[in-house]
């Protein structure tokens, strides 16, 4: 009949029935609750793992892109600096060419001016020599025409100079 379990009397059939129901409940829970629940948990774990992997890949790719951008920015700065240096050198070279051309032109103008002054000086000297010769001949002819005293010669020269001054 009944067995004693902790001092209480419970019929064996009830214990067997309860044990059977408990085991049936465990099997059903495993099949219908823990199985799907564990499947969902496994799927969730895989999903989280995949998301973490994707985030790590995205992070690595972002770091790679940032590094590439930094490298490109660095390269751009180097190219810009080279461009500035070339422009400065070109400006200095162009300045040197312009200054050299200006010096050459100034020297040419100076040489031309010196030659022009020399020509005009020679022409003025030739014209003056011609006038002096003409004046000398004219005075000599006047002196020959009349024998003059010193006072008359001085007066004659002054008159002639006055005549020449008015003719100009």
From Swiss-Prot:
Gene3D superfamilies: 6.10.250.1580. The chain crosses the membrane at residues 9-29. GO terms for cellular component: plasma membrane; proton-transporting ATP synthase complex. PANTHER family: ATP SYNTHASE SUBUNIT B, ATP SYNTHASE SUBUNIT B', CHLOROPLASTIC. F(1)F(0) ATP synthase produces ATP from ADP in the presence of a proton or sodium gradient. F-type ATPases consist of two structural domains, F(1) containing the extramembraneous catalytic core and F(0) containing the membrane proton channel, linked together by a central stalk and a peripheral stalk. During catalysis, ATP synthesis in the catalytic domain of F(1) is coupled via a rotary mechanism of the central stalk subunits to proton translocation. Component of the F(0) channel, it forms part of the peripheral stalk, linking F(1) to F(0). F-type ATPases have 2 components, F(1) - the catalytic core - and F(0) - the membrane proton channel. F(1) has five subunits: alpha(3), beta(3), gamma(1), delta(1), epsilon(1). F(0) has three main subunits: a(1), b(2) and c(10-14). The alpha and beta chains form an alternating ring which encloses part of the gamma chain. F(1) is attached to F(0) by a central stalk formed by the gamma and epsilon chains, while a peripheral stalk is formed by the delta and b chains. Belongs to the ATPase B chain family. This is ATP synthase subunit b. It comes from Bacillus mycoides (strain KBAB4).
């Amino acid at each position: 009949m009944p067995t004693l379990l902790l001092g209480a009397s419970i019929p064996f059939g009830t214990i067997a029935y309860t044990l059977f129901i408990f085991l049936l409940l465990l099997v059903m829970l495993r099949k219908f609750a823990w199985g799907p629940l564990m499947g969902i948990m496994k799927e969730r774990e895989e999903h989280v793992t995949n998301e973490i992997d994707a985030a790590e890949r995205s992070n690595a790719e972002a770091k790679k892109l940032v590094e590439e951008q930094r490298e490109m920015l660095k390269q751009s700065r180097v190219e810009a600096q080279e461009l500035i240096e070339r422009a400065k050198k070109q400006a200095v070279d162009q300045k040197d060419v312009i200054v050299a051309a200006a010096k050459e032109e100034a020297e040419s103008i100076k040489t031309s001016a010196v030659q022009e002054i020399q020509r005009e000086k020679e022409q003025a000297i030739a014209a003056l020599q011609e006038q002096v010769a003409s004046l000398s001949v004219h005075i000599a002819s006047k002196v020959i025409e009349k024998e003059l005293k010193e006072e008359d010669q001085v007066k004659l020269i002054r008159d002639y100079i006055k005549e020449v001054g008015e003719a100009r």
